[in-house]
Regions:
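Metabolite-binding pocket within alpha/beta catalytic cores that recognizes anionic/polar moieties
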Residues: 1-100, 104
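Active-site rim beta-loop-alpha module in soluble metabolic enzymes
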Residues: 95-143
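Generic non-transmembrane alpha-helical segments
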Residues: 105-113, 157, 197-205
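Zn-dependent metallopeptidase/amidohydrolase metal-coordination segment
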Residues: 152-187
Length: 207
């Protein structure tokens, strides 16, 4: 984006990740690419805060669908995440789920702009090769409609530090059929529209 400026760097085993300030009027908005998984994503939240002082994070990306009828063609606004990862337990006391208190802000944005969305729970896991049918069915019974690898951990980091997290997802692969279905995973991973939606959400935040 023209006018963007690199304001910091984070060094990880996979390389150097830039923190980029965007030319957004009247708001201090930046972006960074996070590696997959809660430990890396949550750690980068800590690093970005140390470098920039940022306390509001909009997390967006792809996910697996546990209920393709509910998620097809819609963005997923997460209101709770099942804590099937390790990071969150180092930040807050144990519980099955963690709430996302900002979910209504994201919902209101999609509603106001007539963008298709669904509100629901997600299942955050460290082990994508252990997304078994029995585990999936259990999570579906509890109301989960998606599976991903970051939200529970990142929300725990935000809660511990007194920050705010605004997550939304786009479903890619489909897990609720007879067999795994790649679905729209390629597009969900690479479509730029989520970035531009995140920038618009950033503009309305009180920060």
């Amino acid at each position: 984006m023209e006018g963007s400026v690199v304001v910091g760097e984070m060094h990880a085993a996979g390389g150097v990740y830039e923190i980029i300030k965007l030319p957004v009027k009247e708001k201090r908005v930046g972006i960074f690419l996070s590696p997959c998984g809660a430990p890396a994503a949550g750690g980068f939240m800590e690093d970005v805060n140390a470098v920039t002082g940022v306390e509001n994070y909009i997390l967006f990306g792809s996910c697996g669908s546990l209920d393709s009828e509910k998620t097809k063609g819609k963005y997923i606004v997460v209101d709770e995440a099942y804590r099937d990862e390790g990071l969150s337990y180092h930040y807050i006391p144990p519980s099955d789920y963690i709430s996302v208190p900002t979910w209504s802000v994201t919902r209101d944005f999609f509603e106001k702009n007539s963008i298709p969305y669904v509100v629901g729970k997600t299942w955050t896991t460290d082990a994508f090769y252990r997304e078994t049918r029995s585990s999936m069915n259990k999570r579906k019974e509890e109301g989960c409609i998606a599976v991903e690898m970051e939200i529970a951990g990142c929300q725990a980091v935000a809660e511990r530090r007194g920050w705010k997290l605004y997550p939304f997802l786009e479903s890619g692969d489909i897990l609720d059929g007879d067999e795994w279905n790649i679905g729209e995973l390629g597009g969900a991973n690479h479509r730029n529209r989520k970035l531009f939606l995140a920038i618009e959400i950033a503009k309305i935040l009180e920060c």
